[in-house]
Amino acid sequence: MSLIGRLNLGRRFCTAVPRRSEDIMSNPDCRPSDLCLRVSYLIRCVGDLDTAAKYARLAVFTSIKSESTTTICQSIIGGMLRDKRLKDAYDLYEFFFNQHNLRPNSHCWNYIIESGFQQGLVNDALHFHHRCINSGQVHDYPSDDSFRILTKGLVHSGRLDQAEAFLRGRTVNRTTYPDHVAYNNLIRGFLDLGNFKKANLVLGEFKRLFLIALSETKDDLHHSNYENRVAFLMATFMEYWFKQGKQVEAMECYNRCVLSNRLLVCAETGNALLKVLLKYGEKKNAWALYHELLDKNGTGKGCLDSDTIKIMVDECFDMGWFSEAMETYKKARPKNDYLSDKYIITRFCENRMLSEAESVFVDSLADDFGYIDVNTYKTMIDAYVKAGRIHDAIKTSNKMIDATLKEVSHLF
């Protein structure tokens, strides 16, 4: 039996598990919010999953089972699965939810199902999904993310009919909006098989269901989202036409859904369009769209996110436009609070542009509100060593130790 097949959804008594927090570590602090911060720090900033797992196990002994308690479980299970440590992830799932009867959230179940698909265990993943529904433990399962994972996994496995049935079953309620990413998975699956007619029917079904839900709910926010969601799907049709060598048809899709409508593109849709335009040589249109997103960001008329900026900076690096990469980054950086300097520092180091990386790194150190994680320090240390600047490598290493000790003293 596979690991995922062994997971239970019911409580199971086992004597070989810790019964007190002191069985895990001495003098434990089991306050949920503080424990959550520690686990998150160990996963994201240090990358020490083993120590994070040790602290995460204390979650079962928190006096108040809050949202933070569930987030701890979600974070460590997700971290283990991203690191391909499947047995450790499943052992933690068993420990939290079966041996100690904590209540999972939809993210925990989604992680397990996604890992099943990634291993090719389609039937096991589907069986686990159905058991999750039947258990009734989580009120918001299946979520939008659940359907995205299910449709992607089923399409990848060649089970397009099953994926379509999942989506059809979800939208029986007239007030339920169809999810554009899940529908895009199905559309892409049919287009990859060359079945344009069926893909077009799925697009039409998405539009029909969206408009029905809109008429029932009278939701102004979703009304403004409708054209963006359709444009997101049209990016997949654009790529289909480009692959066929039919540039005119591809750009007709773009003109029809964006230019002729003067669509104020959201970040998610913009990113999908930018990737296709750049991939198939429509660079002038891509840069025009990017500058429109940049100009309208923060005005309430349009937006970009950190991925938008990375797409265009990556394009500069791919073309060998290094000064333009820095200029693009610097212009966009003040308009996005979530873009980490780690990204541009890493890209400069990858391209042996140590002086440029050092410039951004020094600015980050001087920023009182900035935060540099351990991996960014390590990137700079490696770059200094490769350049033969051992003194700078040692100095940066000492700064990393000081910053880490300061952070640890606050958290632990």
Curated annotation (Swiss-Prot):
Regions crossing the membrane: none
PPR repeats: 69-104, 105-139, 143-178, 179-213, 230-264, 266-296, 305-339, 344-371, 373-407
A cellular component annotation (GO) from this entry: mitochondrion
This protein's name: Pentatricopeptide repeat-containing protein At3g60980, mitochondrial
Recorded family membership: Belongs to the PPR family. P subfamily.
Localization terms from the record: Mitochondrion
UniProt record, GO biological process: response to oxidative stress
Transit peptide endpoints, chain numbering: 1-18
The keyword S-adenosyl-L-methionine is annotated on this UniProt entry: no
Classification via Gene3D superfamilies: Tetratricopeptide repeat domain (1.25.40.10)
PANTHER family reported in the protein's UniProt record: EXPORTIN-2 CENTRAL DOMAIN-CONTAINING PROTEIN, PLASTID TRANSCRIPTIONALLY ACTIVE CHROMOSOME 2-LIKE PROTEIN
Alphabetic keyword roster: Mitochondrion, Repeat, Transit peptide
InterPro entries: Pentatricopeptide_rpt, PPR_domain-containing, TPR-like_helical_dom_sf
